[in-house]
């Protein structure tokens, strides 16, 4: 369930981003599904061109065709904020459906953010995306314009975490999407089945309807704003940055592993009048972060507050430090934010996660920034 990078694992080196090495056809099963359903203009798997950039025309056609196949009504374009991460278009050969959707720049390359936004619209979850944005902003937390659609896309499993040795395949929200990424997402959507009250789409809408954050103090808002600003960044083994890093011999454009995400928010990020906040967390790994806090200061599940760092162990609350394998940041009302298989994403502290919750720590209190 969690990305392997949260546990001890060997990492083989991979090709660097932008190298001449042919990218593996990692989405072959999903591409076959897309071709079978006559999506994205491809007539065969062999002619699909998975590593080509996704164009505006192809994405518009895909969204329209998914609406037709799923029976979802057309929805207005998602507009929580004007788009801010559009990639300038360049001329690219594009395949289209028989009746192409009308777009202003057919050959323009589409970003990962634009891919997720279009697909969330196509499956009728625009309102859900807006409700996640509204829930955060109502609590005074600033969020990027992509926040709602990225939360929804990841709750639906529309993104794939590539193996650590292939972290060069990971794409940031602002990076041009590939046809393979679009095919993976489309195949996931087609797997949801009937659109009834028990469907995955209906469940995500229900979660959005109830998304409310508790009252936050100023420091909690600052911490969550930084954490939320990373929504949609990919999971990268050893990653701690939005920018290019070489982690364990693999060049990645940017991203975070579970402890790297917490490290960025509390250790590397600078805040006005932060006092000793950056020195509260000393260790870089999940294990060291978890054992730095004495047992008497560990936070139980029922006592969690927003901006607490939370840890998960193989034996839940009976875990010791050596059994801790994952970490995240508590958001409030049963939600937390993490970097895992879905990249940086919101998740509910229920079920599998609740059973493995070990303890939390409160860096804001440790730094003397709140009682």
Label every PLM stretch briefly:
Residues 236-306, 317, 355:
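Catalytic cysteine-centered active-site loop
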Residues 2-10:
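Bacterial N-terminal signal peptides
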Residues 194-235, 356-371:
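Non-catalytic ligand/cofactor/substrate-binding and regulatory segments of enzyme domains
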Residues 28-36, 57, 61, 113, ...:
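Solvent-exposed, polar/charged alpha-helical surfaces in well-ordered, non-transmembrane soluble domains
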Residues 1, 13-28, 40-60, 64-149, ...:
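Feature responds to low-complexity, polar/acidic, surface-exposed segments characteristic
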Residues 182, 188, 278-290, 297-302, ...:
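Aromatic- and glycine-rich peptidoglycan recognition patches
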Residues 35-39, 64-72, 120-128, 154-158, ...:
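Sec-exported extracytoplasmic/periplasmic mature domains
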């Amino acid at each position: 369930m969690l990305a392997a990078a949260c546990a001890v694992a060997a990492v083989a080196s991979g090709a660097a981003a932008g190298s001449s090495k042919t990218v593996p056809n990692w989405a072959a099963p999903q591409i076959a599904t897309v071709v079978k359903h006559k999506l994205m203009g491809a007539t065969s798997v062999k002619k699909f061109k998975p590593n080509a950039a996704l164009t505006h025309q192809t994405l518009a056609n895909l969204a329209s065709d998914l609406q037709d196949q799923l029976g979802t009504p057309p929805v207005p374009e998602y507009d929580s904020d004007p788009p801010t991460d559009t990639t300038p278009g360049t001329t690219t050969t594009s395949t289209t459906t028989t009746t192409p959707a009308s777009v202003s720049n057919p050959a323009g390359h589409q970003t990962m953010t634009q891919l997720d936004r279009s697909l969330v619209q196509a499956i009728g979850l625009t309102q859900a995306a807006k409700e996640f944005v509204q829930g955060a902003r109502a609590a005074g937390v600033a969020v990027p314009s992509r926040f709602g659609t990225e939360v929804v896309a990841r709750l639906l499993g529309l993104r794939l975490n590539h193996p650590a040795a292939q972290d060069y395949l990971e794409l940031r929200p602002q990076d041009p999407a590939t046809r393979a990424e679009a095919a993976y997402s489309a195949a996931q959507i087609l797997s949801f089945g009937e659109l009834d009250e028990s469907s995955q789409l209906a469940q995500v809408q229900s979660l959005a309807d109830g998304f409310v954050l508790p009252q936050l103090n100023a420091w909690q808002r600052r911490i969550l704003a930084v954490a939320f600003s990373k929504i949609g960044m990919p999971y990268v083994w050893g990653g701690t940055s939005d920018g290019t890093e070489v982690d364990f011999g693999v060049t990645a454009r940017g991203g975070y592993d579970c402890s790297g995400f917490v490290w960025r928010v509390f250790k590397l990020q600078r805040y006005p009048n932060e006092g000793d906040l950056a020195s509260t967390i000393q260790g870089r790994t999940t294990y060291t972060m978890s054992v730095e806090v004495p047992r008497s200061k560990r936070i139980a599940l029922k006592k969690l507050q927003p901006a607490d760092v939370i840890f998960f162990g193989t034996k839940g609350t009976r875990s010791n430090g050596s059994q801790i394998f994952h970490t995240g940041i508590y958001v409030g009302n049963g939600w937390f934010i993490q970097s895992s298989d879905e990249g940086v994403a919101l998740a509910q502290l229920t079920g599998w996660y609740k059973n493995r919750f070990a303890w939390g720590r409160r860096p804001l209190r440790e730094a003397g920034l709140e009682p």
